[in-house]
């Protein structure tokens, strides 16, 4: 399983944009912008290692993600009436299948559940 989560502000600044990545080998990385980006660039901060999940923890997380129901969501959940706010993106690969999901100014419960799982991983790693 691999996963990358991105939270991108819909404001004219990239400060505060944040992302979490879990690699197939269990390596967990994080990035949060604390300085302004170059024009038309989303990220000013590099990936930083946050820790590593062992095979059992990665398998458990994979099953927890599946159990949220996120893989059954429509690819995009967007509130077209909102201005500003936040766009969240998630790329998930489990076995041979890849999923790209977007939630913009809306909180589908399965999407939110996976974000909570990711922050739980970060907390457990002492980040």
Predicted regions and their residues:
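Short, well-ordered, aromatic-rich surface patches in folded extracellular/luminal domains
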Residues: 1-12, 17-18, 56-127
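Hydrophobic/aromatic beta-strand elements that line small-molecule binding cavities or substrate pockets
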Residues: 18-22, 48-51, 90
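Structural signal for glycine-centered tight turns and loop->strand junctions in beta-sheet-rich domains
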Residues: 24-28
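Generic serine detector
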Residues: 29-31, 44, 77
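Surface loops and adjacent helix of pleckstrin homology
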Residues: 31-33, 104
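A short-motif feature that recognizes glycine-rich, charge-decorated loops
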Residues: 33-72
């Amino acid at each position: 399983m691999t996963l990358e989560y991105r939270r991108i502000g819909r404001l004219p600044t990239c400060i505060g944009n944040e992302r979490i990545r879990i690699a197939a080998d269990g390596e967990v990385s994080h990035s949060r912008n604390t300085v302004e980006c170059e024009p038309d660039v989303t990220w000013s901060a590099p990936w930083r290692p946050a820790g590593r999940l062992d095979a059992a923890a990665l398998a458990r997380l994979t099953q927890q993600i599946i159990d949220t129901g996120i893989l059954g969501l429509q690819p995009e959940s967007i509130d077209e009436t909102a201005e500003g706010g936040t766009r969240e993106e998630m790329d998930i690969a489990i076995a041979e299948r890849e999923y790209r999901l977007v939630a913009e100014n809306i909180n589908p419960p399965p999407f939110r559940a996976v974000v909570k799982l990711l922050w739980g991983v970060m907390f457990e790693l002492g980040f």
